[in-house]
From Swiss-Prot:
It is found in: Secreted. Its main location: secreted. Binds calcium. Posterior caeca epithelium of the gut. This is Orchestin. It comes from Cryptorchestia cavimana (Amphipod). Residues 23-95 are annotated as: Disordered. One of its GO terms (molecular function) is calcium ion binding. GO terms for biological process: developmental growth; intracellular calcium ion homeostasis; response to hormone; shell calcification. Keywords: Biomineralization, Calcium, Secreted, Signal. One of its GO terms (cellular component) is basal part of cell. It comes from the Eukaryota. Induction: Indirectly by 20-hydroxyecdysone. The lineage of its organism: Eukaryota, Metazoa, Ecdysozoa, Arthropoda, Crustacea. Residues 84-93 have a biased composition (Acidic residues).
Length: 128
């Protein structure tokens, strides 16, 4: 009885945290993309440099930034492909709690679907 109560309390706390978090990450990523595109549309800034040495330093730092940006853009698709391959592999061997948290990480699930999923878990494990 004590374990059931603890599991119920834990699931309730998780449910409150999950329902309180805005899961509209698609909109925020669209905003970030539009911000980046606005930045790229701006005219390039002209640097007025008196020394040739400082000009070389600024060119080197710009090259380093470009390399870092290209690395980040290359790493993101790799992470996404790794995540999708893990999900497709062995869904039948995962516990219901693993499926629950994996589903919660999916940004396309609605608030009502999260609540229904949580209710199903509570009814199965806590007897509510």
């Amino acid at each position: 009885m004590n374990k059931v109560f603890i599991i119920g309390v834990c699931l309730f706390i998780v449910s409150q945290a999950v329902l309180a978090v805005p899961w509209d990450s698609d909109e925020s990523s669209d905003e970030r993309l539009s911000d980046r595109s606005d930045e790229s549309r701006e005219e390039p800034r002209k640097l007025v440099v008196s020394d040739d040495d400082s000009r070389e330093d600024s060119n080197e730092s710009a090259e380093v930034r470009r390399r870092d940006d290209s690395r980040e853009s290359e790493e993101e698709p790799r992470k996404l492909s790794a995540d999708t391959s893990d999900e497709d592999s062995d869904d039948s061997q995962e516990s219901p709690l693993d499926l629950f948290f994996k589903t919660l990480r999916d940004s396309k699930i609605s608030r009502a679907q999260r609540a229904a999923l949580l209710k199903a878990l509570l009814s199965r494990y806590a007897g509510y």
